[in-house]
């Protein structure tokens, strides 16, 4: 999957360090469901055992690659619901590459794959209200903000609202 200088590919054993750097970034934990760091052993097993098949694994994690095959980030499809043909999207891009269209291209590639090949009906994302960059990303990618969920994520000792974004495959 490629668009311009951005492509998506399955994780490789050589991606271990960069995957650990993203997955073990405590600043990102509050945006997801992680409750602690992954060990090298856990991540090695994930890379080795994942079939990188949404239907087999219940998730699809892809490496975002640009600039001479350098890993720029990770994009995930998870919380897959086969009955209702929908899944949640998550994306993280290296800080030095943010604001350069990398996330937009990666999201476009992922959507094309999910809608055209996998036949999903919809993708959705929960974005903290204060994460203006991510809200702009999903809006510009054609997602519709459907509402705000109050006190949806815990950050430290308080709770924050999130925006619920949805994109429907109009077959």
Stretches found by the model and what they are:
Residues 27-49:
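Conserved GNAT-fold acetyl-CoA-binding loop/helix
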Residues 15-18, 42:
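An acidic, carboxylate-rich microenvironment
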């Amino acid at each position: 999957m490629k668009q311009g200088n951005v492509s998506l590919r399955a994780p490789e054993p050589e991606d271990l360090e960069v995957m650990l750097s993203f997955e073990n970034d405590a600043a990102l934990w509050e945006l997801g469901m992680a409750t602690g760091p992954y060990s090298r052993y856990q991540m090695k097993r994930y890379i080795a055992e994942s079939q990188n098949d949404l239907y087999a694994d219940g998730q699809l994690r892809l490496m975002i690659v640009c600039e001479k095959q350098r890993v720029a980030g990770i994009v995930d499809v998870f919380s897959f619901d086969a009955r209702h043909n929908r899944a949640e999207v998550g994306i993280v891009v290296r800080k030095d590459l943010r604001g350069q269209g990398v996330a937009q291209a990666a999201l476009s590639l992922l959507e094309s794959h999910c809608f055209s090949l996998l036949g999903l009906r919809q993708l959705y994302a929960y974005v903290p209200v204060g994460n203006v960059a991510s809200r702009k990303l999903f809006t510009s990618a054609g997602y519709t903000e459907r509402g705000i969920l109050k006190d949806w994520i815990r950050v430290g000792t308080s709770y924050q609202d999130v925006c619920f974004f949805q994109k429907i495959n109009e077959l």
